[in-house]
Regions:
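C-terminal soluble interaction/assembly domains
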Residues: 327-425
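Catalytic zinc-binding patch centered on the HExxH motif and its immediate surroundings
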Residues: 73-86, 107-128
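Short pre-active-site segment immediately N-terminal to the catalytic Zn-binding motif
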Residues: 130-148, 178
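Acidic helix-start/capping segments at beta-turn-to-alpha-helix junctions
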Residues: 58-78, 168-174, 207-214, 257-261
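Post-HExxH zinc-binding segment in Zn-dependent metallohydrolases
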Residues: 45, 157-208
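A metal-dependent hydrolase signature that marks the N-terminal structural subdomain at the beginning
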Residues: 27-105
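Short helix/loop segments within enzyme catalytic domains
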Residues: 189-215, 244-257
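Pan-zinc metallopeptidase signature
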Residues: 216-340, 354
Length: 425
């Protein structure tokens, strides 16, 4: 039997995704739930989740109450530990360079706000504990659904060891997103199963309407961040359903997905030959821009974020087509002093046609959208399979951009420094 969510559930699921995260976001605050009530409810829902998920409880799920201030501090501390130093700021600079987020965005502040907006609870795989905020009324249907989601994470941890999974790989966002999608997608589908069994006859669409209100931080966040935030739940659930239908529900945990390409195209995960990402090295190990230059950020973007980059510029159809056939990629950002930067990005594609489609679409995106105010059409020249945009050349503030294609590969260079522009890898 093919598993599919009933149509009436999608509105509620969409609303829930604005409420649930690694630290699940707020449900209705009501009367304070005491420890005895929490003990009873967690034990009850744990049994129900275990039965629905088909994973026996190996041990009782530990849980504790926290004040709201303690829980918010916990989330901030976890973010600082998993994204150390200026990692977030360097990610922000890259995202702005390629046009993913507006230049006014403060990525650290926005991310912290998203993770702490009306925080209600979370499961911590390091301690194996479920934390619930004081004053969180666990008797509401919404609260029980969110508890079911987080208890599913506890079960995943007991059986598959979440702490060993690559959820915070600093140099491969695509791998981390694929891993998160398996974990969150599974818990999201469990939550839907729990909801369907426990809350039959309720006006779930009305509940969805109430839940989607009051998400001021989420609504004000850049579209790129909102989509990334929701992707592991929505697309992850569809991936888990596909895996369950084709193989079994635990297959993604026995051998984790390794790319968002596999999440978006489950047949590339469940097929007889998994389509694994190509390992790409953007620059040779001995590449150097000279004195004063420092490599500040290296990462993998992946199919999902490539498609999303086009989507936020109202090119969703073009982006989906351009991102299809992704084989692998890697970028590196170099910076010097306060202003100079040089961005290098190499992508590999399944076919030469895939590479050509990406090159053409990216040229349109940068020329007509991202950098349309920075140069005139006369600045853009085409030579063979390379597109060059050198700006006016009057100052080091002018952007220089190169998109070059060779067979299955597309190489991108963006810099505001003439020396870096002339230094080719």
């Amino acid at each position: 039997m093919t598993l599919r969510p009933a149509n009436w559930r999608w509105a509620l699921l969409t609303a829930l995704m604005f409420w649930v995260a690694d630290g699940c976001q707020a449900a209705e605050a009501g009367s304070t739930t005491n420890t005895a009530e929490a003990d009873r409810l967690v034990e009850q829902i744990s049994r129900q989740v275990s039965e629905l998920r088909g994973l026996p409880l190996k041990k009782p799920i530990q849980h504790a109450m926290m004040s709201r201030a303690q829980l918010e501090a916990f989330v901030k501390k976890a973010m600082a530990e998993k994204l150390p130093g200026d990692y977030v700021e360097q990610s922000e600079f890259v995202y702005k360079t390629i046009g993913a987020i507006p230049h006014k965005t403060n990525l650290r502040e926005t991310t912290l706000a998203l993770l702490t907006e009306q925080v209600a609870g979370l499961y911590d795989e390091e301690t194996g504990k479920l934390y619930v905020v004081e004053g969180f009324d666990l008797q509401t249907p919404m609260a029980k659904m969110i508890l079911a989601h987080e208890i599913c994470h506890a079960l995943q941890d007991q059986h598959f060891n979440l702490g060993e999974m690559p959820m915070a790989v600093l140099d491969n966002d695509d791998l981390a997103m694929a891993t998160s999608s398996a974990i969150e997608g599974d818990a999201t589908w469990l939550m839907m199963e729990y909801m369907g069994k426990e809350f039959q006859g309720m006006d779930l669409l009305a509940m969805a309407s109430r839940m989607s209100a009051g998400q001021a931080v989420f609504d004000a966040s850049p579209a790129f961040m909102r989509k990334i935030y929701v992707f592991p739940y929505m697309s992850g659930m569809e991936f888990i359903l596909a895996a369950a239908n084709k193989v079994d529900r635990n297959a993604p945990f026995r051998a984790l997905p390794t790319s968002t390409e596999q999440i978006l195209h489950p047949e590339k995960f469940t097929g007889p030959l998994r389509d694994e990402p190509t390992s790409v090295t953007v620059l040779k190990p001995d590449f150097s821009l000279g004195e004063g230059w420092k490599s500040t950020h290296k990462n993998v973007i992946g199919e999902m974020q490539i498609a999303l980059l086009f989507e936020v510029w109202r090119m969703a159809g073009e982006g989906e087509k351009a991102a299809a056939g992704w084989g692998g990629d890697q970028y590196v950002m170099f910076r010097k002093g306060a202003n100079a930067f040089a961005f290098y990005w190499r992508t590999e594609w399944d076919t030469e046609r895939d590479a050509e489609e990406f090159e053409e679409a990216l040229g349109v995106l940068f020329q007509d959208k991202v950098y349309r105010k920075a140069f005139s059409g006369d600045d853009w020249t085409t030579s063979g399979t390379a597109r060059l945009w050198a700006g006016s050349g009057e100052s080091d503030e002018d952007i220089r951009l190169r998109i070059a294609r060779e067979k299955y590969e597309v190489f991108v260079q963006i810099t505001n420094d003439e020396h870096a522009w002339q230094t080719q890898p």
